[in-house]
């Protein structure tokens, strides 16, 4: 049969049944030649993982399966191998040889042995052989007889030398698998080396090894099935039979934990043993009764062992120091006692000196009970306890050896500090001048002790010495193996640390039986110890409800990892015994109060109606503003950072009512550690969170929870306050209410103009570097973008970097109108489409882009910019030009002398002033009059808009605006008298009228008559009145044309670019103020939507239905949204709009 080549030279075997073939003569010889040419490492070069004691069940099965997969198992042929016997071997009959060809039989001391005829690599397998294996537990000793009985099988297998499982001389394994016998080498076998095998029966799962493990351990011989195992123990017991047994273990009798090295056991006894916890009451009582036993107690605070004599105690101290008794310190090094000025040159001498302080000395300190041999040493030591330079009184010293001892804890703590710090110096791996916290404190104490005099001692040195700054828990000698962080002591008493993580130096290739049994004993030990321990059952008892409980914070965790993270980072016990944590210097122990010293109001009173001015005509606006001086205190890392910056402006406020303001219309919820909480949360005695049903032990922890972790921290501010019973109508809207399309397209000053009333205009102005401060009362036109809050620290992140504003100074010019507009903008989320422009961009800014719809439906041309779209509609669109010609022909019939009046700027200015004075505003109008024409004031439902238009016209320094205004009159469509007083702006019945208002005939006729009084061609330099034939508000669809064209016919309009138009228009203002660049001096005759010569309201309404951009189209077509008044030329865009963006969804987001 053919054999495939292999990458590594390895013996190829065949089943025993194939030995009859004729190939038996040539194959072993060829194989032997190939293998002999290969250089195989000897036994010592192979990894230790193939040692018998380190060979796991997985490794054995690997070798077994490897032989099975290769299909190479064999046994050699006796006839062919008989010719290859070495001549130097003793005469052995090979006629009966039935073993493999790589092996041969020889006799030594009259016994038949099996040896290798050539080098054999690890993993060489022979088999399978028919046979049965019977184990004899007594025969597993070294040099035992054959531990099995073969009912059938090869005879050579009986001649193999058998050893115990743990003998290191083993080089092969014989195992039973599936009722058949196999033999595999576990080491590299050289030529002529004897085969020494051990037995493993996989069918019986190593019953002998398991029994031996139980009988030779600490615990009595009990079978695992007789013990009630935990689920974790059952999993460990399943892999225990395959574990390697290690005799060199070091058990802890207190905990039942086995260690593979004595060093690990010593570290466990020092830091982690459950017996190391000191019981305070019994120890103190015992010491009070038996003061002579002080010398027999271990001075380490972590150890509770007692000894009968000093020698035994010295031997025990050796385990703490980690050095031998005979070792001396390096040359030039010394150990100084922190109790006195003694210096030792060896560790044993230093220990003996420490005993002198604990034994019955002649002089004993009354404070710490340390003993001293001379009075001078006692006086030097008592200097540490005296707060001033005075010597202690005679009553402080005791010349009697039988002094009362209240507690040994201070003495043992100080002794432990001195002993451990000096012992760490004595370690070879420790540097004598290390800069750890212990060494620093120790050096300071040593310097003080060596320089002091018994008579005179400065008081400053005494104050430098501090017992509390020295950590009582010493650092672990092996940082890599210690789960406790160095220099960080536990804040609660703990038992043994039961780590679930394996450290790198403890990870081995195969599982150790000692480790498995130790973990199993740990689980049992936890159950047995539960209930009798003095420390809290944090991680010891599986009988607890679930998880671990932090008793300081009264929080139960169902995951141990979460508990440990909580104790390390969040537990309230971290703040005990320290005013400020060194790791968190910016966090104080007490939460600072976010109350302004300049005002008696706090953030709790933000929604209190008694703290604000009342307006009987506007009951919904009584609590819409907060005290701005209170809000000013909410900035900065500690809540009072910018108080000085705003102190001068706050002093300028005339009255307390005049300082009422609100940021974006809602109480500020600043994300600061000292941020304001509502009334119930600021109670210093409140520790229970009703929303989360958690009770905290400290108010500070409760405050941190409410600020960062509470489930209600994302709710609107009014929803948080359970104590403030604010009426439903006084509450603001949701913070994250989504703005609709018609709201986004409005300038911020015009979204809710009816809420701007004259009685709220008496608030003094805050200085603003971006605006002028000459006029005391400003209009809506001067208000900055409401998203730019009045604090420099919380300017919205969507502001462009080119914003001409220094964030280190107060941003806004908070005028009278803004204090109310900001209230209106409160519930609107951040509009990322509204970018604040820089100063250079404000002078040349075009109208605000009308969403993203810039397509001329008549010409089927789309534009990327609004400027290009408007220019097209003004100059190139054929429908616009046609309407311009038609409207121009009507001008001569309706207005007899339009040119003469248009050419007279004085007359036009006078007429505009007359129309503005009719509305009650003596100020000069602004260009916003193009939107709110004077004829609109005659309409019954739009009188408020006329007032808003006059407020807008009170200031014309529009170049300082943060927001480039666009005169979008869509809000006129949805405003209806008193409805505008509601801050919700929900869906009203008037919103569903098809793109127009329901206007009474009398109102239309009155507006028509009023408009007929003014000539149509009047120039719009001041912008208050728009004399034209139109008597109805302009349609939102044509808002771009309204802004640019202004609704006037332009007979003398120069064909110049928008910048030139702006320059020419700015020169026409009488008050010398500049107008914004987006106001176009384009006096077209009339609006495209409305036919100018309509005498009655029915004809006017029918003219409104005239199509978008001048095209006659029914509003009820399939691509026209009547509610939003938007025409779509694509059905898919229309469907997407109705599904996601239509204003009909507004009611869905108001809760």
Swiss-Prot record:
GO terms for biological process: atrioventricular valve morphogenesis; cardiac muscle tissue development; cardiac muscle tissue morphogenesis; embryonic organ development; fat cell differentiation; heart development; in utero embryonic development; lung development. The modification Phosphoserine is found at residues 532, 581, 904, 1014. Residues 1-13 have a biased composition (Basic residues). Residues 1-53, 65-101, 389-486, 637-684, 1004-1035, 1049-1093 are annotated as: Disordered. Zn(2+) 1 binds at residues 252, 255, 268, 273. GO terms for molecular function: DNA binding; RNA polymerase II-specific DNA-binding transcription factor binding; transcription coactivator activity; transcription corepressor activity; zinc ion binding. A motif (Nuclear localization signal) lies at residues 736-740. Residues 829-835 are annotated as: Interaction with CTBP2. It comes from the Eukaryota. Disulfide bonds: none annotated. A zinc finger (CCHC FOG-type) spans 244-277, 542-575, 681-714, 848-881, 1113-1146. Residues 18-33, 70-79 have a biased composition (Acidic residues). Zn(2+) 2 binds at residues 550, 553, 566, 571. Residues 401-410, 447-485, 647-658, 1004-1023, 1056-1067 have a biased composition (Polar residues). Expressed in heart, brain and testis. Weakly expressed in lung and liver. First expressed at approximately E8.5 in the developing ventral heart tube and septum transversum. Cardiac expression persists throughout the remainder of embryonic development in the atria as well as in all layers of the ventricles (endocardium, myocardium, and pericardium). Expressed in the neuroepithelium of the developing midbrain and hindbrain from 11.5 dpc and increased in intensity between 12 dpc and 16.5 dpc. Disruption phenotype: Mice die of congestive heart failure at 13 dpc with a syndrome of tricuspid atresia that includes an absent tricuspid valve, a large atrial and ventricular spetal defects, an elongated left ventricular outflow tract, rightward displacement of the aortic valve and pulmonic stenosis. These mice also display hypoplasia of the compact zone of the left ventricle. PROSITE patterns: ZF_CCHC_FOG, ZINC_FINGER_C2H2_1, ZINC_FINGER_C2H2_2. GO terms for cellular component: cytoplasm; male germ cell nucleus; nucleoplasm; nucleus. Zn(2+) 5 binds at residues 1121, 1124, 1137, 1142. There is a cross-link at residue 444 (Glycyl lysine isopeptide (Lys-Gly) (interchain with G-Cter in SUMO2)). Belongs to the FOG (Friend of GATA) family. Transcription regulator that plays a central role in heart morphogenesis and development of coronary vessels from epicardium, by regulating genes that are essential during cardiogenesis. Essential cofactor that acts via the formation of a heterodimer with transcription factors of the GATA family GATA4, GATA5 and GATA6. Such heterodimer can both activate or repress transcriptional activity, depending on the cell and promoter context. Also required in gonadal differentiation, possibly be regulating expression of SRY. Probably acts a corepressor of NR2F2. The CCHC FOG-type zinc fingers 1, 2, 3 and 5 directly bind to GATA-type zinc fingers. The Tyr residue adjacent to the last Cys of the CCHC FOG-type zinc finger is probably essential for the interaction with GATA-type zinc fingers. This is Zinc finger protein ZFPM2.
């Amino acid at each position: 049969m053919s054999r495939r080549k292999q990458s590594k030279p390895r013996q190829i075997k065949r089943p025993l049944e194939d030995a009859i073939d004729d190939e038996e003569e040539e194959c072993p010889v060829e194989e032997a030649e190939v293998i002999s040419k290969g250089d195989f490492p000897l036994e010592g070069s192979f990894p230790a993982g193939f040692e018998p004691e380190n060979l796991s069940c997985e490794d054995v099965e690997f070798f077994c399966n490897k032989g099975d997969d290769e299909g190479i198992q064999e046994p050699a042929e006796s006839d062919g191998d008989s010719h290859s016997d070495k001549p130097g071997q003793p005469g052995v009959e090979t006629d009966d040889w039935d073993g493999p060809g790589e092996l041969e039989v020889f006799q030594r001391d009259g016994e038949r042995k099996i040896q290798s005829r050539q080098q054999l690599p690890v993993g060489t397998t022979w088999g399978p052989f028919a046979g049965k294996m019977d184990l004899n537990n007594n025969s597993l000793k070294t040099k035992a007889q054959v531990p099995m009985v073969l009912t059938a099988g090869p005879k050579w297998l009986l001649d193999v030398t058998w050893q115990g499982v743990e003998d290191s001389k083993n080089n092969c394994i014989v195992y039973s698998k599936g009722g058949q016998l196999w033999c595999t080498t576990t080491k590299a076998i050289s030529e002529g080396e004897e085969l020494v095998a051990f037995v493993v029966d996989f069918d019986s799962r190593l019953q002998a090894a398991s029994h031996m493990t139980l009988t030779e351990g600490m615990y009595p011989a009990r079978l695992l099935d007789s013990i009630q195992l935990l689920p974790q123990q059952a999993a460990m017991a399943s892999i225990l039979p395959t574990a390697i047994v290690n005799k060199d273990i070091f058990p802890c009798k207190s905990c039942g934990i086995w260690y593979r090295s004595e060093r690990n056991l010593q570290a466990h006894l020092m830091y982690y043993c459950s017996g190391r916890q000191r019981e305070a009451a019994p120890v103190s009582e015992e010491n009070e009764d038996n003061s002579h036993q002080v010398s027999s107690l271990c001075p380490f605070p972590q150890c509770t062992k007692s000894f009968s004599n000093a020698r035994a105690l010295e031997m025990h101290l050796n385990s703490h120091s980690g050095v031998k008794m005979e070792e001396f310190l390096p040359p030039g090094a010394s150990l100084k006692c922190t109790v006195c000025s003694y210096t030792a040159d060896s560790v044993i001498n230093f220990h003996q000196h420490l005993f002198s302080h604990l034994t019955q000395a002649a002089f004993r300190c009354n404070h710490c009970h340390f003993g001293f041999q001379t009075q001078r040493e006692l006086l030097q030591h008592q200097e540490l306890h005296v707060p001033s330079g005075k010597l202690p009184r005679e009553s402080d010293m005791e010349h009697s050896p039988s002094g009362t001892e209240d507690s040994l804890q201070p003495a043992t703590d100080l002794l432990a500090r001195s002993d451990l710090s000096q012992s760490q110096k004595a370690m070879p791996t420790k540097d004598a001048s290390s800069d750890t916290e212990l060494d620093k404190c120790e050096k300071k104490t040593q310097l003080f002790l060596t320089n002091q005099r018994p008579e005179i001692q400065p008081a400053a040195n005494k104050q430098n010495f501090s017992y509390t700054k020295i950590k009582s828990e010493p650092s672990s000698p092996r940082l890599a193996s210690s789960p406790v962080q160095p220099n960080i002591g536990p804040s609660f008493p703990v038992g043994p640390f039961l780590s679930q993580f394996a450290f790198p130096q403890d990870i081995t290739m195969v599982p150790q039986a000692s480790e498995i049994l130790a973990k199993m004993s740990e689980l049992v030990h936890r159950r047995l110890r539960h209930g009798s321990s003095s420390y809290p059952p944090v991680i010891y008892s599986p009988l607890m409800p679930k998880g671990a409980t932090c008793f300081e914070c009264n929080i139960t965790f169902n995951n141990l990892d979460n508990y440990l993270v909580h104790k390390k980072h969040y537990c309230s016990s971290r703040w005990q015994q320290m005013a400020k944590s060194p790791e968190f210097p910016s966090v104080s122990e007490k939460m600072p109060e976010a109350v302004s010293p300049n005002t008696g109001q706090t953030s709790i009173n933000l929604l209190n109606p008694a703290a604000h001015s009342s307006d009987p005509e506007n009951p919904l606006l009584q609590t819409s503003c907060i005290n701005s001086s209170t809000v000013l205190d909410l900035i900065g890392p500690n809540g009072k950072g910018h108080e000085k910056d705003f102190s001068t402006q706050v002093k300028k406020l005339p009255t307390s009512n005049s300082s009422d303001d609100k940021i974006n219309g809602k109480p500020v919820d600043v994300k600061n550690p000292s941020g304001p909480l509502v009334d119930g949360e600021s109670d210093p005695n409140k520790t229970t969170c009703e929303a989360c049903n958690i009770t905290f032990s400290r108010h500070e922890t409760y405050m941190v929870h409410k600020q960062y972790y509470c489930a209600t921290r994302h709710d609107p501010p009014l929803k948080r306050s359970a104590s403030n019973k604010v009426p439903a109508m006084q509450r603001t809207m949701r913070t994250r209410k989504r703005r609709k399309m018609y709201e986004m397209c409005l300038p911020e000053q015009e979204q809710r103009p009816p809420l701007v009333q004259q009685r709220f205009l008496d608030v003094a102005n805050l200085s603003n570097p971006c605006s002028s401060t000459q006029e005391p009362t400003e209009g809506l036109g001067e208000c900055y973008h409401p998203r730019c809050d009045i604090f420099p620290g919380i300017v919205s992140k969507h502001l462009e970097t080119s914003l001409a504003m220094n964030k280190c100074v107060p941003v806004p010019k908070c005028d009278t109108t803004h204090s109310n507009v900001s209230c209106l903008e409160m519930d609107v989320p951040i509009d990322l489409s509204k970018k604040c422009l820089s100063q250079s961009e404000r002078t040349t800014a075009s109208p605000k882009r009308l969403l993203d719809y810039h397509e001329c439906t008549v010409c089927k041309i789309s534009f990327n910019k609004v400027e290009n779209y408007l220019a097209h509609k003004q100059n190139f669109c054929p429908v616009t030009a046609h309407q311009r010609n038609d409207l121009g022909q009507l001008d001569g019939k309706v207005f007899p002398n339009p040119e003469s009046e248009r050419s007279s700027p004085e007359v036009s200015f006078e007429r505009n002033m007359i129309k503005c004075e009719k509305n009650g505003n003596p100020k000069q109008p602004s260009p916003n009059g193009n939107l709110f024409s004077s004829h609109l004031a005659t309409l019954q439902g739009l009188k408020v808009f006329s007032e808003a238009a006059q407020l807008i016209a009170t200031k014309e320094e529009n170049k300082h605006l943060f927001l480039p205004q666009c005169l979008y009159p869509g809000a006129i469509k949805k405003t209806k008298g008193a409805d505008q007083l509601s801050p919700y702006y929900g869906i009203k019945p008037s919103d569903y009228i098809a793109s127009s208002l329901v206007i009474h005939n009398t109102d239309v006729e009155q507006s028509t008559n009023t408009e007929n009084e003014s000539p149509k061609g009047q120039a719009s330099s001041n912008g208050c009145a728009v004399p034209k034939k139109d008597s109805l508000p302009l349609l939102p669809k044509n808002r771009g044309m309204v802004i640019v064209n202004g609704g006037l016919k332009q007979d003398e309009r120069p064909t110049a670019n928008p910048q030139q138009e702006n320059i020419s228009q700015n020169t026409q203002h009488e008050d010398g103020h500049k107008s914004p660049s987006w106001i176009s001096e384009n006096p077209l005759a009339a609006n495209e939507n409305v036919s100018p010569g309509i005498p009655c309201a029915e004809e006017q309404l029918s003219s409104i239905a005239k199509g978008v951009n001048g095209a006659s189209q029914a509003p009820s077509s399939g691509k026209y949204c009547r509610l939003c008044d938007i025409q779509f030329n694509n059905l898919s865009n229309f469907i997407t709009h109705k599904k996601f963006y239509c204003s009909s969804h507004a009611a869905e987001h108001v809760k």
